[in-house]
Amino acid sequence: MKILYIVLDGAADSPTSPRKTLEEASKPNIDSLGSHAVCGMVYTVKPGVAPQSDYATLSLLGYNPDEYYPGRGPLEAFGAGIEMRRGDIALRANFATVDPGTLRIIDRRVGRSLTSREARELASAVDGMELEDGEGTALFRATIGHRGVLVLRHRSKPLSDAISNTDPAYERRGRFSVALEKYEPFIKLSNPLVEDEAAVLAARMLNEFTLKAVEILDSHPVNLAREKRGLLKANAILSRDAGGLPEEKPPSFQERFGLRGASIVEMVVERGISRYIGLDDIRVEIEGRAREEVYREEAARAVEALETHDLVYVHLKGPDEPGHDGSFEGKIRAVEDIDKHFFAPLLDRLSSAGLEPAFVVTSDHATPWDVGAHSGDPVPLMISHQSIQGSIGKFSETVCLRGRLGTIIGGYRIIPKTLSLLAG
């Protein structure tokens, strides 16, 4: 049995939202899957928790994040292709604009105007930076736009990830960072969060990297050229969410489920999760391309991947961003675009290839347009295959709230539930 596991990023709204995207959007291709399907709701993490995307994605792929989550930094590093060693720490990072004299932050994301090419050039200027009088090293990779990942390594001493962020907009709480409503707009030097030599050393190395990066980047040719064009300089790097390698590597996806899996994802952290659990990473170029073109290629690659894999996981971007913007109409358009440009060609290609896979369709989290942020609400879940008796009709919150699957606590239960259902 082949399985297509399709996640609509942030497509769900809250059951209490006055209007719901999945109910009002015209999505005949998605809804056609409901003719042989069962449905329900799922808390991808747990009730009342507004999931972070990486935590939810790991859960959806069958791994309880409370047991297997290594931290955002390492997942970003895996996705960027950095081979971490025991004792390294990794942090997610982004280029920012600061006053180099006072370290006052002018823009945390360089006005979202930094191209990936510019970011790669700037990253090369700080990658391999020597720290601690040559005893330490910083590895830095640009990923997408203003985003990047930083790995700190010491030659002879282990580093601890128990350190605070240099990004003042996020406060470290346990393994996560939470966005602060108010903060002082200055680079915040890192501090150890425990009384431990490894944490003291890690914080010191992060601070050294952060300050040296401002000196190097402020006068970099890329930034001088941007300044001449009236654009903000990308002259600082803000870091958060430090993490180290887990004590034990998780069982691979094939070991866990007996399935050969592949993923088609866009974000570096999602790619990192795929590599972390041993999914084959199928790349689709997104930079400089229309969203509709990307969807069509993702559909084509998904069908190709089914020829050689048992399960293909596809994480589709689109609805989450207008949800954050509070745009109901934007979420409607995003879901309709997915239906027209991904699901329609996908179903055509499957028919032409004579393939009849099972479908799992859900969201990684709700991003209710009337809230403008991720919420702790459950999201709709549909499992579809020609062998399933019964029809659900429209795929939506209202229908799935009454569904046969009930409410599942934990996205990591979806794959076992699907396999059990398909086994009869």
Swiss-Prot record:
The task this protein performs is described as:
Catalyzes the interconversion of 2-phosphoglycerate and 3-phosphoglycerate.
Report the superkingdom from the record. Archaea
A GO biological-process term: glycolytic process
Q: Which residues form a coiled coil?
A: none
Question: Which pathway does the UniProt entry assign to this protein?
Answer: Carbohydrate degradation; glycolysis; pyruvate from D-glyceraldehyde 3-phosphate: step 3/5
What's the source species for this entry?
A: Aeropyrum pernix (strain ATCC 700893 / DSM 11879 / JCM 9820 / NBRC 100138 / K1)
Known NCBIfam families for this protein? Answer: apgM (TIGR00306)
Query: What InterPro entries does this protein's entry cite?
Result: Alkaline_phosphatase_core_sf, ApgAM_prokaryotes, Metalloenzyme, Pglycerate_mutase_ApgM, Pglycerate_mutase_ApgM_sf
As recorded in UniProt, its EC number(s) are 5.4.2.12
In terms of SUPFAM superfamilies, this protein maps to: Alkaline phosphatase-like (SSF53649)
Question: What is the protein's given name?
Answer: 2,3-bisphosphoglycerate-independent phosphoglycerate mutase
Keywords linked to the UniProt accession: Glycolysis, Isomerase
Q: Which family does it belong to?
A: Belongs to the BPG-independent phosphoglycerate mutase family. A-PGAM subfamily.
Instruction: Provide the organism lineage as a comma list.
Output: Archaea, Thermoproteota, Thermoprotei, Desulfurococcales, Desulfurococcaceae
**Reaction(s) catalysed by this chain's protein:** (2R)-2-phosphoglycerate = (2R)-3-phosphoglycerate
Q: Name one GO molecular function term.
A: metal ion binding
